Amino acid sequence: MNNNKGGFLRSSVFYIFIFLAVVGMVYGLFGNDKTTTKTITSSEFIKALNDKELKSVTVQPGNSIYNVTGTYKKAQTATKDKGLSLFQPTQKVTKFTSTLLPNDASLKSVTDAATKTKTELVTKQAENSGFWLNLLVSLVPVLLIVAVFYLMMNQAGGGKGGQGGMMSFGKSKAKPSDPKDNKVRFADVAGAEEEKQELVEVVEFLKAPKKFVNLGARIPKGVLLEGPPGTGKTLLAKAVAGEASVPFFSMSGSDFVEMFVGVGASRVRDLFENAKKSAPAIIFIDEIDAVGRRRGTGMGGGNDEREQTLNQILIEMDGFEGSEGVIILASTNRSDVLDPALLRSGRFDRKILVGAPDVKGREAILNVHAKNKPLADNVDLKAIAQQTPGYVGADLENLLNEAALLAARRNKSKVDAADIDEAEDRIFQGPAKTNHNMSESERRTTAYHEAGHALVGLVRSEASVVRKVTIVPRGRIGGYALMTPKNDRYNLKYSEAKEQLAGLMGGRASEIFMFNEASSGASNDFQQATGLARQMVTAFGMSDKLGMVQLEGNASVGYADQAGNRAYSEETARLIDEEVRRLAREAFDDAIAILRDNKDKLTAIAEALLEVETLDEKQIKDIYLTGTFTRKDIQDDTELAKAKSFEEAKAAADAKDSQAEQRFEKQDEEKSSDDHSESKNEDTDSTDKSETDDNNTENK
């Protein structure tokens, strides 16, 4: 709207100038009457007066001069005088105007000349309007400057109630939220029951403080939510805002600091002042590590500004005046970099770790996000929760959302297990490259590589299970073997770590064992294996040579300063490298031994991969135990992937849907014919018949 107003103003001024120009032209052409007034100098006036050319003279005091007007006895002829119109070269002049110096000598000379020539002389008093006119003329520029300055200030401030303008830098952007606008409640937060209870207590204290005050308790001044990304820290804060019947101020840590010095501290003061006026109130600072980092670890003016902002937060939370009636919630996934003064009791009294949910928590989260999604009968949310250890709430929500998008792409009315399985692959590995043409040699190498991972994982299966093996290219990989822990893992044993290392080395071991040649496909395996082996040696104390010490793996351990200088000697570094190589070599030798003892099973898994490209957990176990597996109908999106336009993609999806309908109709016809034949058997007991129908349905 501001742009439109500015354009209208500019166009109005333009039309005003056009109008004035036209008026000036009209006045120049037609405005001058035939009786023209001529402006003459003082000398010309005195000469004309002495020559008896003037009929009458009028003298009137003006602005520091005497204004003289009068008429000629005879009309004068004027030629192109500057006081005349350009379109009238010659005119008859009967009147004149002139000026005199405002002194007695000038006035006496005019009076004497008029008396001598017997010319009529008239004197008038000065007009009072001149004073007001002069005053107005002098005030107009001042008023214009004041108006322009006011408009600039108003525009810089963002208008009425505006934010982000030049003059509002020191004002906090946080506004109290209306609980009616926030639909998130504690019932919408699943998988974090203990964390939720801690925050429910805070809300209860605000609503009914007498229950706690009677026992001498005080509400925590600050609650810090810490944990990995995606675990629901901000969602918990939204639930607090939705449940609390008090003003809720929300602000990001990065919103405090701007390009001007002192803005951050000013915004902190303004935020807490507004919260204190609305007390009891809650302040939520998201990603507080953006402003609450440890002091003295950086250089430059930006760091000084951040430290000044942090100091103001420390003062407001627990300074001389305190912040009575105001509770501070904050979230971060980097609590290790926060300043110790910020974390001490009296500021953040309660620290809540919001970690990855366990299997029950994952199932509860899946149930929450599946409420608005129609699921097929073959979808088991409990099984999905068991198969997704380490997933956080954001991952699970994205998993079901991607599955719903895939089901819509395939023109399904419900989300089935195949959609969820494909969605998991797409999220973590990328979409399948169905048009990626691999040579037969590359496919065979990839198949044996992934079969090596799977076989070692099947043999060393005390802690992990092989869920899937595929040679379908996705993202930057040509295939992968998915192995997940059997249960939620909170500690890693030495034997379990050795299992993981052997599984990671299974791919390269299979290449060497079958083809006696290595490929670049194991680079990511080596990266993971090296990282795990290094952690075993430097962080977990699993090396006899180095002992039970922590050399790396912590921000305060392993490095003496910010420049990255190591706190241990070169000899220790050499021992670390030797131990990492030893663990990797032992894992490789273990994998080679497993493959040598199970060569027939390795070949069976690889040939099955070359045939169907993807094997699930049951198929892999069947091949390992029996040498055969059951093939299943796999969703094929090849035609959808090849489509070049929306119309072609829609046609391909409709064709697939039509084929599926024909298949279902055929099954229904077979079922109806079976039911019809059974109805003819009059000797069958009704109870037995009902059981037979149920069995037939289950088999189908």
UniProtKB/Swiss-Prot annotation:
The active site is at E450. The keyword Membrane applies. It is found in: Cell membrane. Binds 1 zinc ion per subunit. InterPro entries: AAA+_ATPase, AAA_lid_3, ATPase_AAA_core, FtsH, P-loop_NTPase, Pept_M41_FtsH_extracell, Peptidase_M41, Peptidase_M41-like. SUPFAM superfamilies: FtsH protease domain-like, P-loop containing nucleoside triphosphate hydrolases. Its cofactor is Zn(2+). It is a multi-pass membrane protein. Keywords: ATP-binding, Cell membrane, Hydrolase, Membrane, Metal-binding, Metalloprotease, Nucleotide-binding, Protease, Transmembrane, Transmembrane helix, Zinc. ATP binds at G227, P228, P229, G230, T231, G232, K233, T234. Zn(2+) binds at H449, H453, D525. GO terms for cellular component: plasma membrane. Its EC number is 3.4.24.-. Homohexamer. Acts as a processive, ATP-dependent zinc metallopeptidase for both cytoplasmic and membrane proteins. Plays a role in the quality control of integral membrane proteins. In the central section; belongs to the AAA ATPase family. This is ATP-dependent zinc metalloprotease FtsH. It comes from Leuconostoc mesenteroides subsp. mesenteroides (strain ATCC 8293 / DSM 20343 / BCRC 11652 / CCM 1803 / JCM 6124 / NCDO 523 / NBRC 100496 / NCIMB 8023 / NCTC 12954 / NRRL B-1118 / 37Y). The lineage of its organism: Bacteria, Bacillati, Bacillota, Bacilli, Lactobacillales. The gene is ftsH.
